Amino acid sequence: MKQKAFGVIQSYYKHSPVYGGVFYACFFSMHTRIDIVLCGQQSEEEFLLVVDAIYDRLCQIEKLGNCYDADSELAQLNQFAAIRPQPVSHELYNMLAFCVDCNARTNGHFDITVHSTDYTPDLISKVQLSPKERTLFFQHPGININLSGFLKGYALESIRDLLRSYEVKNALVNMGNSSVLALGKHCLLYTSPSPRDK
């Protein structure tokens, strides 16, 4: 078990000379339990580095887009963007622009302003993103952006990129049983007994 700054990563590793290693880890992040299974020829230490990187990345994403964390960038924007245009970090700006575009592409069914005071379906049109200045301004008081319907999917795509960078080809990542990423071969194949093992 490895102690981290904001929680605990619990892990288990099993190695087979025939199939390689299976590494399991779990920890809490983004208000849910994260379960990770990694399979391949990497060592336990190499897999733990991957999980550490995933944990750190999820903490980073939370600090950007968790509107329930008063210290997050998004919470600060929600507080001040109706007063004057607020500068936005590159990554969060791209998230917001993507979500506003999704609202248009889904005919309003995906809406990050749905938790706003006095919400109406056209309230998102009052969210002004300025790409040149990279700022956010609310043209109506009471707007509150909530990325909860987006953030886990975004996190899984970030995890996919991390797994590729660490050359992990077989993985299963479960975020609270609601958002799942599966890559490569079924990890249970790595633990199935071989006829040669009998």
Residues covered by each model-derived region:
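A glycine- and small-aliphatic-rich helix-loop capping segment at beta-alpha/alpha-beta transitions
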Residues: 164, 186-189
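Single conserved hydrophobic/aromatic residue that forms the stacking wall/gate
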Residues: 190-198
